[in-house]
């Protein structure tokens, strides 16, 4: 109940004109707005380096990452898509793109714009990807270098069964 009361206080301060069902913008607590008034330090400064290391370590614990890495990107989601394709897929390489909404379509566009080939596994809006369909698509395209899956497709409100899909994609 305490959180709801605090959120109500913030809501009263910013009182948005419209309800946005997106990842942002969001209402901020007054304490956060106060901290945001402080001058930011450079991403090349030692303070940033320490903050980055601390943040990665905290995220590893929070996300229960025992193997692998946590990567932070100072960009939009599209920037992350582009970085993953440019750095993870060979020029002319093939990517299997699952499409269940606008963000899957964007990934396909990013793949093709960056000189890679996109093979799609597309569903009608409101439907999640199916592991058996992914398995079939991978058998038809054994030369794909990567599979893209939008976990939470906010454009349609669909959550993909990521654990099941990941087992097939491995």
Report the location of each language-model feature:
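Short beta-strand segments
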Residues: 74, 98, 122, 148-151
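Generic structural signal for well-ordered, non-membrane alpha-helical segments
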Residues: 25, 29, 33, 44-52, ...
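Conserved PLP-anchoring active-site segment centered on the Schiff-base-forming lysine
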Residues: 88-105
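N-terminal "arm"/small-domain region of PLP-dependent enzymes with the aminotransferase-like
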Residues: 2-46
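Active-site-proximal loop->helix
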Residues: 106-117, 124, 132-137
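Active-site phosphate-binding strand-loop segment of PLP-dependent enzymes
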Residues: 129-170
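Conserved N-terminal alpha-helix of the aminotransferase class I/II PLP-enzyme fold
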Residues: 35-83, 102, 106-112
């Amino acid at each position: 109940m305490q959180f709801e009361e605090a959120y109500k206080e913030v809501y009263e301060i910013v009182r948005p004109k419209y309800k946005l069902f997106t990842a942002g913008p969001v209402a901020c607590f007054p304490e956060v707005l106060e901290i945001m008034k402080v001058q930011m330090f450079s991403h090349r400064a030692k303070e940033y380096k320490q903050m980055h290391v601390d943040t990665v370590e905290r995220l590893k614990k929070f996300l229960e990452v025992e193997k692998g890495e946590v990567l932070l990107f100072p960009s939009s989601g599209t920037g992350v898509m582009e970085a993953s394709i440019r750095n993870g897929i060979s020029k002319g390489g093939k990517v299997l793109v699952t499409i269940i909404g606008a963000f899957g379509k964007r990934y396909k566009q990013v793949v093709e714009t960056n000189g890679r080939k996109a093979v799609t596994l597309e569903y009608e809006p409101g439907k999640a990807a199916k592991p058996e369909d992914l398995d079939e698509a991978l058998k038809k395209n054994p030369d794909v270098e990567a599979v893209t899956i939008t976990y939470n497709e906010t454009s349609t409100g669909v959550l993909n069964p990521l654990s099941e899909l990941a087992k097939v994609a491995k």
